[in-house]
A protein has these predicted regions:
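Collagenous Gly-X-Y triple-helix signature in extracellular proteins
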Residues: 11-243
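Short, intrinsically disordered N-terminal pre-domain segments
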Residues: 1-11
Length: 243
């Protein structure tokens, strides 16, 4: 006796999610994530571990996204303390901000170990498996293409992302510029400034480097990493889920 094949298959079986895989997207591409029910543009700024650097562990091997425009202006910390791990901005990024993302986004974003300078007058960089466990984070100065050859006070708390250009030339600066309400504005980084305990690096409104006290309200551009298997809708480029 043979087995009957029911036309249409199992009606309870979910259809596979299809779309454009994050890992196939060109660096510089724009995609969309949902924030508070609104589709917001993010740029693909790197594929894989930045510069294949051992500062990053395998958790950072994915598709790096950076919010195209500045989200808002807020202080890095409530006091002039540049200890990133305990900062108000790290708490906000992984709390209030992350909770505004859609359920698809929250499920897809990777938990990673990001390299970071301890701060508070301590220039030690914790990296690899000792990095800070986060889902959303600020970029560092080296990731934007600056190094200690540009300014001694830059800590080596990351390596250049593919989207950015090394140095301080006009084209390198142009790629770092971000806007708030359609006007270029300064945005803050996770890199503490120098050996002091109260200031942090920022990217100014011309794309050059600057710094500010940690309690100053500067622009915030959240970054996050998706698995390369995450899928985007072919028409809208909105994140759909994972394969």
């Amino acid at each position: 006796m043979g087995f009957a094949i029911v036309a249409g298959g199992n009606p309870n079986m979910a259809a596979p999610v299809t779309g454009i895989a994050a890992g196939t997207l060109a660096v510089g591409s724009a995609v969309k994530l949902m924030e508070s029910g609104t589709a917001v543009e993010y740029l693909v700024v790197n594929q894989g571990k930045p510069s294949n650097s051992n500062l990053y562990d395998s958790s950072c091997d994915g598709t790096w996204l950076l919010r195209k425009n500045i989200h808002s202006q807020r202080p890095w910390n409530s006091s002039n303390s540049n200890v990133y791990a305990n900062s108000a901005i790290n708490t906000w990024l992984n709390g209030d901000f992350f909770n505004t993302l859609g359920s698809v986004e929250q499920a897809a974003v990777k938990q990673i170990k990001i390299p970071y300078c301890v701060g508070g007058g301590n220039s030690t960089v914790n990296s690899g498996a000792n990095g800070l466990s986060v889902k959303a984070f600020l970029l560092g100065g080296y990731e934007l293409g600056w190094t200690s050859s540009n300014l001694d006070n830059f800590h080596h708390d990351g390596d250049k992302l593919e989207y950015f250009i090394s140095g301080t030339g006009a084209e390198a600066n142009r790629k770092r510029i971000a806007t708030l309400n359609n006007s270029p504005a300064q945005w803050t980084l996770r890199t503490p400034y120098g050996e002091g305990s109260g200031a942090v690096f920022a990217c100014d409104n011309t794309g050059g480097y600057g710094y500010d006290l940690a309690s100053t309200s500067d622009g915030i551009r959240p970054a996050l990493i998706l698995p390369k298997t995450a899928l985007f809708d072919e028409d809208t480029m909105i994140l759909k889920g994972a394969a």
